[in-house]
Amino acid sequence: MALEYPPHLRYVDTHEYIRVEDDIAVIGITAYAVDQLGDIVFVGLPEEGTEIEKGESFGSVESVKAVEDLYAPVSGKVVAVNKAVVDSPESIADDPYGDGWLIKVRMTNPEDLDDTMSAEAYASLVEGS
């Protein structure tokens, strides 16, 4: 089954995606990351109000295969945390780009998005073409 990378999202090479809603960045992990991790058993996320910095770890995802850090694609303040995925981490795999989002961040520097990739560029990265 081919993995999907919706064209309206932005991507980073650490396998997070960004859905931009005005000055809010909705951040999650890509279908590629979900596929590589396998069964996700734990998600550690920051609390609302936490300041995160672009390029720095803001949490982790644990699967039966590995524990991977989550890296912030943008800087800002966490304004929402998806408690549903904290309570049921395996649900991320069902809809990584929809209900499986991780955090929402009010961006302090929207120019951070300049360093993100299109769906096409991200697909080329992960598919090695």
Swiss-Prot record:
Signal peptide: none annotated. SUPFAM superfamilies: Single hybrid motif (SSF51230). Its cofactor is (R)-lipoate. The keyword Magnesium does not apply. One of its GO terms (biological process) is glycine decarboxylation via glycine cleavage system. Keywords: Lipoyl. Disulfide bonds: none annotated. Binds 1 lipoyl cofactor covalently. PANTHER family: GLYCINE CLEAVAGE SYSTEM H PROTEIN, GLYCINE CLEAVAGE SYSTEM H PROTEIN-RELATED. Belongs to the GcvH family. This is Glycine cleavage system H protein. It comes from Synechococcus sp. (strain JA-3-3Ab). The gene is gcvH.
